[in-house]
C-alpha cells in the first residue's frame, strides 16, 4: 500500500466516534455516621435537625408497578471518585451511587447559610464555555426537608481531567448533560461528608425531574463498547486507591472464576430476587424469597428490622448507638458465616467480611455490618446489598441485558 493511500484511512479513524473502557479510581473515606460518632455526635440528632433519608418524593406512575421509596441515606457511603463538569473541567468528588439516578453538585450560588456548600467544591457556570442555561428548579427530598437548586447543562468528564490532574486512565466526555446545581443542602448532614455530590447510576425511572442519567446519556452518545459498568471495592482499609469503577467493561484481574448473573426484577433501582439468607448457626431469613437492591452508595447490609434483629442475636451482636450493633473483637473469628442465596447460588460472607473495625473515643470497636430498616409495602420489604457484599463479590451492572453479575472478588 502506498503511503498516500493511508491518509483516507487515517482520517476515517480520526473521525470515527471513540468508544472507551474507562477506569475511575475510587477512594475510601470515613462515612458521615462514623465521623459523627468519633466526635461524639448523634445520628439521631442529625435526623432531628436535618433529613438524611434518600428519595421520598412520589415518582410518576408507570406500568411496571410501584417504585420503592426512601431506600437509604448517605450516612454510610464510603467510596468516592472524581468527575469534571464544564470546559475546562471543574473537578468534584462524587459518590457513584447505583441507588439513585441524578447528578448534583454544590453551586457557586448556594445560600449564605448553607455551610455544607461553602466547605465543598462548587460549580461556577461563568467559568465554563460549554454551559447551557436550563434554570428549572429541582428538589430531592430527604425526609422532612429537601436538597434544592436548579438544573443546568454542561459537559461531564469521567474521570476529571483538568490540566492540573491529567489522567493516564483514559476517559470520556459526556456532552449536553443536565445536572443539578444545589443551592440548599438541608440540615447539617452534608457538612460531615467527604464528597461534594452524587452521581446516580440507577435507571431513568427514578430520576428526579425526568433528567436523563449520566450513564444513559453516555449510552446514547455511544461512548463505550458495552453498556455495562463494574465495581471493585478493595477490602484492604489501607489500599489506595480503594477500588475501581469501570465503564464499558470488566477486568478479570479483579475476580476469581466466572460471573453469575441475575435478571433485574424492576427497572428502577438495581433490584434482584433474593432466595434467602442463612446464618450458619441455623437461622434462616427471607424464607419465602424477597427482593433486594444492589447499592454502591450504602456501605452496610440492610434488611427488615425484625429479621435483622434476629440475625444480630444469632451472631451475638448487642445494640450500641445509632442503630449500630457491637461484637466483641476477640469473638469475631468464632462467629458463624452468613450466606445469601441469589439465583440458586450461595454467596458466603465470613465473619471478617460482615464485621467492621472502627475507632471511637480512642478505642477499637467491632461492629456488625448489618443494619435494620423497614421499607413498607407495596415496595417493600426489601434488603439492600451494600459495600459489605460488593467488597466481597465483584459486581457488574449490565444495561444491555438488564442484569447484575457477581463473582468472588480477588484479593490484590
UniProtKB/Swiss-Prot annotation:
CC annotations in GO: collagen-containing extracellular matrix; cytosol; endosome lumen; endosome membrane; extracellular exosome; extracellular region; extracellular space; ficolin-1-rich granule lumen
Disulfide bonds: 91-160, 110-117, 286-290, 329-366
Catalyzed reaction equations: Specificity similar to, but narrower than, that of pepsin A. Does not cleave the 4-Gln-|-His-5 bond in B chain of insulin
Annotated glycan sites: 63, 134, 263
Keyword field contains Membrane: no
Residues annotated as catalytic: 97, 295
Protein's cellular compartments: Lysosome; Melanosome; Secreted, Extracellular space
EC number: 3.4.23.5
Record keywords, A-Z: Alzheimer disease, Aspartyl protease, Disease variant, Disulfide bond, Glycoprotein, Hydrolase, Lysosome, Neurodegeneration, Neuronal ceroid lipofuscinosis, Protease, Secreted, Signal, Zymogen
Propeptide: 21-64
One Pfam family from the record: Asp
Post-translational modification: N- and O-glycosylated.
Subunit structure: Consists of a light chain and a heavy chain. Interacts with ADAM30; this leads to activation of CTSD. Interacts with GRN; stabilizes CTSD; increases its proteolytic activity.
The name this protein goes by in its record: Cathepsin D
Lineage: Eukaryota, Metazoa, Chordata, Craniata, Vertebrata
Gene name per UniProt: CTSD
Amino acid at each position: 500500500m502506498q503511503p498516500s493511500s493511508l491518509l483516507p484511512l487515517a482520517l476515517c479513524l480520526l473521525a470515527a466516534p471513540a468508544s472507551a473502557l474507562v477506569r475511575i479510581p475510587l477512594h475510601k473515606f470515613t462515612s458521615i455516621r462514623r465521623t459523627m460518632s468519633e466526635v461524639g455526635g448523634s445520628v439521631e440528632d442529625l435526623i432531628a435537625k436535618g433529613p438524611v433519608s434518600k428519595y421520598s418524593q412520589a415518582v410518576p406512575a408507570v406500568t411496571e408497578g410501584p417504585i420503592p421509596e426512601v431506600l437509604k441515606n448517605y450516612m454510610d457511603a464510603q467510596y468516592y471518585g472524581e468527575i469534571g463538569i464544564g470546559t475546562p473541567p471543574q473537578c468534584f468528588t462524587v459518590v457513584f451511587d447505583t441507588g439513585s439516578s441524578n447528578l448534583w453538585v454544590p453551586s457557586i450560588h448556594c445560600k449564605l447559610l448553607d455551610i455544607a456548600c461553602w466547605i465543598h467544591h462548587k460549580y461556577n457556570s461563568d467559568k465554563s464555555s460549554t454551559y447551557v442555561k436550563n434554570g428549572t428548579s429541582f428538589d430531592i427530598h430527604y425526609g422532612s426537608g429537601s436538597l434544592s437548586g436548579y438544573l443546568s447543562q454542561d459537559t461531564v468528564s469521567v474521570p476529571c481531567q483538568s490540566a492540573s490532574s491529567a489522567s493516564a486512565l483514559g476517559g470520556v466526555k459526556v456532552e449536553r448533560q443536565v445536572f443539578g446545581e444545589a443551592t440548599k443542602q438541608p440540615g447539617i448532614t452534608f457538612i460531615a461528608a467527604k464528597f461534594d455530590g452524587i452521581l446516580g447510576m440507577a435507571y431513568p425511572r427514578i430520576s428526579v425531574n425526568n433528567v436523563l442519567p449520566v450513564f444513559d446519556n453516555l449510552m446514547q452518545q455511544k461512548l463505550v463498547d458495552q453498556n455495562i459498568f463494574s465495581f471493585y471495592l478493595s477490602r484492604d482499609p489501607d489500599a489506595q486507591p480503594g477500588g475501581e469503577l469501570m465503564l464499558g467493561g470488566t477486568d478479570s484481574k479483579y475476580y476469581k472464576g466466572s460471573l453469575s448473573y441475575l435478571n433485574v426484577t424492576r427497572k428502577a433501582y438495581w433490584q434482584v430476587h433474593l432466595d434467602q439468607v442463612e446464618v450458619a448457626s441455623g437461622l434462616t431469613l427471607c424464607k419465602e424469597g424477597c427482593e433486594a437492591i444492589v447499592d454502591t452508595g450504602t456501605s452496610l447490609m440492610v434488611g427488615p428490622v425484625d429479621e435483622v434483629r434476629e440475625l444480630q442475636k444469632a451472631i451475638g451482636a448487642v445494640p450500641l448507638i445509632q442503630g449500630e450493633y457491637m461484637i466483641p473483637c476477640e469473638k469475631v473469628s468464632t462467629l458463624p458465616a452468613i450466606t445469601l442465596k441469589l439465583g440458586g447460588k450461595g454467596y458466603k460472607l465470613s465473619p471478617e467480611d460482615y464485621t467492621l473495625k472502627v475507632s471511637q473515643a480512642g478505642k477499637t470497636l467491632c461492629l456488625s455490618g448489618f443494619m435494620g430498616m423497614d421499607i413498607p409495602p407495596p415496595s417493600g420489604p426489601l434488603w439492600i446489598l451494600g459495600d459489605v457484599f460488593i467488597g466481597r463479590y465483584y459486581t457488574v451492572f449490565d444495561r444491555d441485558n438488564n442484569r447484575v453479575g457477581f463473582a468472588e472478588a480477588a484479593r490484590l
